[in-house]
Design a protein with these regions (language model features):
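Short active-site loop/helix that positions an aromatic residue
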Residues: 241
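Sec-type signal peptide cleavage vicinity
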Residues: 1-225
């Protein structure tokens, strides 16, 4: 996740992918499991490096289907984030500088990110969505020869990312951190919905340029729910005779008005 100083804090659900190369320059992808350091900027991960292979680089977050061909890494920016708990999952890369000592890996961001805090969330809300002018999810490639590798969406493209969470009357505020590819965006729209037919707010940002490791911080938004009667609903109510006076008064009603003052 991300703290108030916009530094990445590790979580106990995090995992890394360690890519190792053999004598034939074929790569393996080994999962490194979280061990300690939740809530800190540094954490410890454990795993086993394949025998006879050399550690080359590490990727966050771990994805089982990540692969390397030549100098190109292929991974995914998911269009759907289920059971979202506020994690950023922003993709990062760390080059191994000493294959014999993996005790300190320094990660670099490979994308940008949008941060948005939503307050006064309705109890029925279950979905946060980002809709962009560019492709923001799908299969991505990374040029590993670059000094600062970045993700580029290349196939199975989507212009939407949806983060779903469990509806709750107790949670009134949520932070959303959604990774976005670098680039120039004519529009980026955020929505909070109930997952089907109700949109609680829509916020659109125009003409944004996002570079590697940029965080687009949107001022906090409050959800406001307004109940209104539509003309059709009013007509239906008036058509029901029970909503109208049933009979006129039998006696005339006289109202006296006294006016005083200088005229």
């Amino acid at each position: 996740t991300v703290n108030d100083e916009y530094k990445i804090l590790w979580q106990d659900t995090d995992a890394l992918g360690l890519f190792c190369s053999n004598a034939e320059s074929n790569y393996s992808n080994t999962k490194l499991e979280y061990a300690s350091g939740a809530g800190q900027t540094s954490a410890t991960f454990n795993g086993s490096k394949p025998s006879g292979e050399t550690a080359v680089f590490s990727i966050y977050p771990y994805q089982q289907n990540m692969s390397v061909s030549g100098n190109t890494l292929t991974m995914t920016l998911p269009a759907t984030l289920t059971n979202y708990n506020g994690s950023s999952n922003g993709p990062m890369y760390a080059k191994v500088t000493n294959p014999d000592n993996l005790s300190a890996l320094s990660f670099k961001h490979m994308a940008a990110m949008i941060k948005l805090t939503v307050n006064k969330i309705p109890a029925e809300a279950t979905t946060f969505k980002i809709i962009a002018s560019n492709n923001i999810a799908g299969t991505c490639t990374v040029d590993l020869t670059a000094a600062d590798p970045i993700l580029a969406v290349t196939s199975d493209e989507s212009k939407e990312i949806t983060a779903s969470f469990t509806a709750s009357a107790d949670i009134k505020s949520r932070n959303f951190y959604i990774p976005l590819p670098t680039g120039t965006y004519s529009s980026i729209t955020a929505q909070l919905t109930n997952g089907s037919d109700k949109v609680y707010f829509t916020k659109t940002l125009n003409d944004k340029i996002l570079g590697r490791r940029d965080i687009l911080v949107v001022p906090p938004l409050d959800c406001v729910v307004v109940e209104a009667t539509t003309p059709s609903a009013l007509s239906t109510a008036l058509a029901d005779s029970k909503n109208l006076p049933q009979e006129a008064p039998t006696a005339a009603t006289v109202t006296d008005i006294a006016v005083s003052g200088s005229f």
